[in-house]
Amino acid sequence: MQEGIHPEYGPVVFYDRSADKYFLTKSTLVAKAVNLPTIDWEDGNTYPLVNVEVSSYSHPFYTGKNVVIDAAGQVQKFNARYGRK
């Protein structure tokens, strides 16, 4: 690998808001950690925290449940515009 062209890669905690689950993994978002909130993890270390709406904990493909996640009222807007009358 060439020196100096790859982004910084390190541990980050992701929080799935819809499933209320936290998980620690590695990400290139650690380079933007200055702008991110932090969280004290179970191992005693502090990591950057990234909020996500969908992860493997809440995605219908992984959970086997058909759930409509509508964060901004988009389904209602669509039904109002194009729904059956």
Swiss-Prot record:
The keyword Repressor does not apply. One of its GO terms (molecular function) is structural constituent of ribosome. The keyword Ribonucleoprotein applies. Pfam families: Ribosomal_L31. It comes from the Bacteria. GO terms for cellular component: ribonucleoprotein complex; ribosome. One of its GO terms (biological process) is translation. Part of the 50S ribosomal subunit. Belongs to the bacterial ribosomal protein bL31 family. Type B subfamily. This is Large ribosomal subunit protein bL31B. The lineage of its organism: Bacteria, Bacillati, Actinomycetota, Actinomycetes, Bifidobacteriales. The gene is rpmE2.
